[in-house]
């Protein structure tokens, strides 16, 4: 999450969540609105953790902010729940909305995804993310107000603290 301070999960966290979801027949939904579509150096942030969500939501990154678009992508298992006749691939729930027929968002998204792929931007994100994480780590070594740096790819954060030992957050007025 970005709003929470670019908190990265501990090793095994997502695998455990998926295990619990499977055990109790709960659908695993992962929100990739902030960290998806290349920001972490893979198409989706969850790909770093070896899980297979049932549903993934994404928005901003799909068209790099050039057009308003949001998506819900599901597994085939979830998609089949919306079919009246599971044997007919065209017999599914359809939702019509005010802007449902507008092709600007999908066109921008398709072009954006093509550019990300053609220009190897995932690889670039990995390389630049390593460079930036190293630079932030170097800054942390020289400035006691940086208590931690973390993240993946270019989805990074630096935690500002007034005391590095106990990680007391920096007073907002000083920031």
Stretch-by-stretch model annotation:
Residues 1-175:
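Conserved N-terminal phosphate-binding loop of PLP-dependent enzymes in the Aspartate aminotransferase
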């Amino acid at each position: 999450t970005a709003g929470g301070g670019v908190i990265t999960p501990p090793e095994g966290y997502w695998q455990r969540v998926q295990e619990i979801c499977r055990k109790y027949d709960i659908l695993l939904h992962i929100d990739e609105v902030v960290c998806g579509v290349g920001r972490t150096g893979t198409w989706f942030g969850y790909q770093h953790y070896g899980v297979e969500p049932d549903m993934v939501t994404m928005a901003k990154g799909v068209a790099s902010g050039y057009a308003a678009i949001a998506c819900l992508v599901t597994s085939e298992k979830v998609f089949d729940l919306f079919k009246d006749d599971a044997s007919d691939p065209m017999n599914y729930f359809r939702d019509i909305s005010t802007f449902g027929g507008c092709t600007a968002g999908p066109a921008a998204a398709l072009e954006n995804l093509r550019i990300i792929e053609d220009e190897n931007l995932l690889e670039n994100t990995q390389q630049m993310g390593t460079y930036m994480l190293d630079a932030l780590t170097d800054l942390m070594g020289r400035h006691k107000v940086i208590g931690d740096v973390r993240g993946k790819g270019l989805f990074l954060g630096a935690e500002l603290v007034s005391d590095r030992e106990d990680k007391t957050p920096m007073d907002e007025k000083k920031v």
